[in-house]
Amino acid sequence: MYLESSAKPANKKQPASHKASSKESIRHVVCFKFKEDADPTAIRKVEREFTALKAKIPGIRSLEWGKNNSPEGLNKGFTHCFIVTFQNDKARTVYLPHPDHKAFVSILKPILDDVFVIDFNP
């Protein structure tokens, strides 16, 4: 997910030990908190459009998602989680500015309250 944000990254520069190798797969975890007045039909469209990216953007090895069902109550309003597995760092680099990804973001933004993204190597 690549969204412009006014929030400052907590740690923009990562230690070398945390940088992805060009051959390692990357997990891209994206959690959404929708606006309280978001139309359920618009949320379903976001679900469909995000999952459709797997067929549109090369280098996505897998994509899975689900809605929060934790009984702990610690989700802070985040309801949807998507996990995209990229073949490697190059695939993620292609994904972020890809026109289909940007089109998805334009569908998402009007109903999005907050987003949380973390990438890691499994």
Briefly describe each language-model feature range.
Residues M1-T79, Q87-V94, F120-P122:
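Short S/T/G/P-rich N-terminal loop/turn motif that feeds into the first structured element of a domain
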